[in-house]
Each structure stands twice: as structure tokens, then as C-alpha cells.
From Swiss-Prot:
Cellular localisation: Nucleus; Chromosome
Region (Disordered) location: 1-41
Record keywords: Acetylation, Chromosome, DNA-binding, Methylation, Nucleosome core, Nucleus, Phosphoprotein
Gene3D superfamilies named in the record: Histone, subunit A (1.10.20.10)
Listed name of the protein: Histone H3.3
Function: Core component of nucleosome. Nucleosomes wrap and compact DNA into chromatin, limiting DNA accessibility to the cellular machineries which require DNA as a template. Histones thereby play a central role in transcription regulation, DNA repair, DNA replication and chromosomal stability. DNA accessibility is regulated via a complex set of post-translational modifications of histones, also called histone code, and nucleosome remodeling.
Similarity-based family: Belongs to the histone H3 family.
Signal peptide positions (record): none
Residues recorded as bearing N6,N6,N6-trimethyllysine in the entry: 5, 28, 37, 80
Biological source species: Meyerozyma guilliermondii (strain ATCC 6260 / CBS 566 / DSM 6381 / JCM 1539 / NBRC 10279 / NRRL Y-324) (Yeast)
Post-translational modification N6,N6-dimethyllysine, affected residues: 5, 15, 28, 37, 80
Modified residues (N6-acetyllysine): 10, 15, 19, 24, 28, 37, 57, 65
Modified residues annotated as Phosphoserine in this record: 11
Amino acid sequence: MARTKQTARKSTGGKAPRKQLASKAARKSAPVTGGVKKPHRYKPGTVALREIRRFQKSTELLIRKLPFQRLVREIAQDFKSDLRFQSSAIGALQEAVEAYLVSLFEDTNLCAIHAKRVTIQKKDIQLARRLRGERS
């Protein structure tokens, strides 16, 4: 048999369409309702871990200044009315309070991990304070 030269042919785009199953056809023929896209959601815990990393890197104060100032003034009212505070004094109080809370939460987290949990509970805070000698 003699060899013949083959000429290039235009392709028609792959495989021939197959018949769809009844369930697929029913799904495709159903009307699309508005095309509203669901908002993206991260897996549980992903955002929490991202926030932990972000706050551990940062050095700024985490409690808002004005609400903290109102709280300090409200507590000070119980001891003496008409007390005045320098802004630097309230700033120093806020630094001390935040440092205390961060270290308390670190100890609380260790107590929860010791109990084979990842969620901190009230009893973890109580145990951490008791071990520190703050509360009997």
C-alpha cells in the first residue's frame, strides 16, 4: 500500500456529548435563584489563630482609652469624689492592667492545657490566681 500525505484538519473540539443522567439533568434545568454568592467562611479556629499571631506581634494597647478612663474614674469615685488624673497616670494604669491581664490569660491557658482542654474556663482563671497567691 502506498503512503499518502496527510493534510491538517480543523479539530471539532474533543469528545462527543454524552447523555446526561436524569438527576443531573434535573439539577441543571432548575432555575437559578438570583445568583447570590455565599460569603467566604474560614474553618473554625483559623481566624482566632490569625488574631493571636497579630496581637502577639503588636505593642499597642488593646483596651480603648476612653472606656478605660471612664472605668478608672468610676472606681475612684468609690474612694474619693472629685479626684483628678493626669493623662500619663491613666496611661500607666492601662499599661499595668493590660500586662497583668495578658499574663493571667497565659497562665489560664496553661491550666486549660493541663486539663487536656483548649477552651479556657472560669475554673482555670480561679486556679491560676490561686497558684499565684492572689486568692485563697
